[in-house]
């Protein structure tokens, strides 16, 4: 049971990359949202996602799912 509680309370940044999807957990804010570029702040750095037809499919308090033809991911 402790492991489940640790997961629920976890505040570390996590990114999971799928084909044409990126799931980002424990982000701070969405800075730029355009069809070809999305920038997300994760406290100490930003993630820049570039591609075509980018959309934010799901947004939760601490998680966001980006979909589209992703061509580049940068950590700054």
Language-model features: locations:
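N-terminal intrinsically disordered, cationic/polar leader segments
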Residues: 2-76
């Amino acid at each position: 049971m402790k492991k489940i509680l640790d997961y629920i309370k976890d505040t570390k940044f996590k990114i999971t990359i799928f084909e044409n999807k990126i799931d980002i957990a424990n982000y701070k804010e969405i800075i730029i949202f355009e069809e070809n570029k999305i920038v997300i702040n994760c406290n100490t750095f930003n993630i820049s996602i570039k591609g075509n037809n980018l959309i934010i499919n799901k947004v939760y308090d601490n998680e966001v799912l980006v979909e589209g033809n992703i061509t580049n991911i940068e950590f700054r």
